[in-house]
């Protein structure tokens, strides 16, 4: 029996690798448990309970990129966050604590380290975030997804495993065999959409009119641009499924011949595992421009093309879609190279190390817990 506490979140890019780890842990043994720690404002407050896992909350804010007053407020909140973290850890008694980035991971992982609980962090991006850079000095293991991140951490702690992918997405993708006659383009910009991508894609339609009978689009717009984008496709006579949010990404990937999207770490992990050619448009306001650094790894491998949003026009995007559609051999090459970067076993490798950390510290049966605690059954994911 093993109990893993996963700390962090805030965005899907941080949280979903943690969900993937949780799925791997609870499927290994019916008595394994996973508990998450996050913030009320983060995406975890909605997603984690829906997935069937317990969630503890701490009140903590980021320190980087704030004005003076906001920084003071965040600093004053830190002691309380540490106290909350110690209480949660004492109550939950995890065998291992894994930080996945985001505000909550800092105080929780640091408190676990001070309590002698084995710790690890998982860095999703090629350019590590502030919290993980700090935590990398004290944790036992640092899991990275890009070779470029290695230089930011103590070499002996680093393990390159890739970004864990949710079991549901992988299993459904492998079962999906969607036949389609038209060249299918999947367009999305994250769960909230991306106005820059939405605008450039609808502008690109003006230069793709002669291909409208051979193209099909699946476009996730987010809430704000849904109606305007839907109208753009309809007015120009293109076949398109325009939705606010795609619930079944595995089927969307299975149907796609080409993907136009941002360059978040989780998205890139999905592209490589699903072996998809892509046009990447990094989020221009990402911290330290980390999405562009992420994208560069795929571009250098020949698996993707990248355009800066500020330099990309609708006409240029249309030209790129046209060229890739006209050269299927190039698309196949990009797909093959994307697949070579994929790491479908990342969650398994991460869970294996968690087991090793538990055994090294507590023995094969983990920490001693009261009979009532020991009989608790791990909440199961709905995935």
Curated annotation (Swiss-Prot):
It catalyses: di-trans,octa-cis-undecaprenyl diphospho-N-acetyl-alpha-D-muramoyl-L-alanyl-D-glutamyl-meso-2,6-diaminopimeloyl-D-alanyl-D-alanine + UDP-N-acetyl-alpha-D-glucosamine = di-trans,octa-cis-undecaprenyl diphospho-[N-acetyl-alpha-D-glucosaminyl-(1->4)]-N-acetyl-alpha-D-muramoyl-L-alanyl-D-glutamyl-meso-2,6-diaminopimeloyl-D-alanyl-D-alanine + UDP + H(+). UDP-N-acetyl-alpha-D-glucosamine binds at residues 11-13, 125, 166, 191, 246, 291. GO terms for cellular component: plasma membrane. It holds the Pfam family Glyco_tran_28_C. The keyword Cytoplasm does not apply. InterPro entries: GlcNAc_MurG, Glyco_trans_28_C, GlycoTrans_28_N. Residues 364-383 are annotated as: Disordered. Its EC number is 2.4.1.227. Residues 366-383 have a biased composition (Basic and acidic residues). It is found in: Cell inner membrane. The keyword Metal-binding does not apply. GO terms for molecular function: UDP-N-acetyl-D-glucosamine:N-acetylmuramoyl-L-alanyl-D-glutamyl-meso-2,6-diaminopimelyl-D-alanyl-D-alanine-diphosphoundecaprenol 4-beta-N-acetylglucosaminlytransferase activity; undecaprenyldiphospho-muramoylpentapeptide beta-N-acetylglucosaminyltransferase activity. Keywords: Cell cycle, Cell division, Cell inner membrane, Cell membrane, Cell shape, Cell wall biogenesis/degradation, Glycosyltransferase, Membrane, Peptidoglycan synthesis, Transferase. Pathway: Cell wall biogenesis; peptidoglycan biosynthesis. Disulfide bonds: none annotated. Its main location: membrane. It is a peripheral membrane protein. GO terms for biological process: carbohydrate metabolic process; cell division; cell wall organization; lipid glycosylation; peptidoglycan biosynthetic process; regulation of cell shape. Belongs to the glycosyltransferase 28 family. MurG subfamily. NCBIfam families: murG. Cell wall formation. Catalyzes the transfer of a GlcNAc subunit on undecaprenyl-pyrophosphoryl-MurNAc-pentapeptide (lipid intermediate I) to form undecaprenyl-pyrophosphoryl-MurNAc-(pentapeptide)GlcNAc (lipid intermediate II). This is UDP-N-acetylglucosamine--N-acetylmuramyl-(pentapeptide) pyrophosphoryl-undecaprenol N-acetylglucosamine transferase. The gene is murG.
């Amino acid at each position: 029996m093993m109990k893993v506490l996963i700390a962090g979140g805030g965005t899907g890019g941080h949280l979903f690798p943690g969900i993937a780890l949780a799925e791997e842990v609870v499927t290994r043994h019916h008595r394994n448990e996973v508990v998450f720690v996050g913030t009320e404002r983060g995406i975890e407050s909605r997603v984690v309970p829906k997935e069937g896992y317990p969630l503890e909350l701490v009140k903590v804010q980021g320190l980087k990129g704030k004005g003076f007053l906001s920084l003071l407020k965040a600093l004053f909140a830190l002691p309380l966050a540490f106290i909350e973290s110690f209480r949660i850890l004492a109550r939950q008694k995890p065998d291992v604590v894994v930080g996945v980035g985001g505000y909550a991971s800092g105080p929780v992982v640091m408190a676990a380290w001070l309590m002698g609980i084995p710790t690890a962090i998982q860095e999703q991006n090629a350019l590590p975030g502030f919290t993980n850079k700090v935590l990398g000095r004290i944790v036992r293991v640092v899991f990275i997804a890009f070779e470029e991140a290695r230089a930011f951490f103590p070499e002996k702690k680093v393990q390159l495993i890739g970004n864990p992918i949710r079991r549901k997405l992988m299993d459904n993708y492998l079962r999906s065999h969607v036949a389609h006659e038209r060249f299918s383009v999947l367009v999305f910009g994250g769960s909230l959409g991306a106005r820059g991508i939405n605008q450039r894609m609808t502008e690109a339609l003006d230069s793709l009119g002669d291909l409208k009978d051979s193209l099909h689009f699946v476009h996730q717009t987010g809430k704000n641009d849904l109606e305007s984008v839907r109208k753009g496709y309809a007015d120009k006579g293109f076949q398109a499924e325009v939705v606010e949010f795609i619930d079944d990404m595995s089927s969307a990937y299975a149907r796609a011949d080409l993907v136009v999207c941002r360059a978040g770490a989780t998205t890139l992990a999905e592209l490589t595992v699903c072996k998809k050619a892509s046009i990447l448009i990094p989020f221009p306001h990402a911290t330290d421009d980390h999405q562009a650094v992420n994208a560069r790894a795929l571009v250098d491998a020949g698996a993707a093309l990248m355009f800066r949003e500020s330099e990309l026009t609708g006409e240029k995007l249309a030209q790129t879609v046209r060229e890739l559609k006209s050269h299927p051999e190039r698309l196949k090459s990009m797909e093959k190279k994307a697949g070579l970067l994929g790491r479908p076993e990342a969650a398994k490798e991460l869970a294996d190390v968690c087991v090793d950390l538990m055994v090294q510290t507590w023995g094969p049966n983990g920490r001693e817990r009261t009979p009532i605690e020991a009989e608790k059954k791990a909440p199961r994911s709905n995935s």
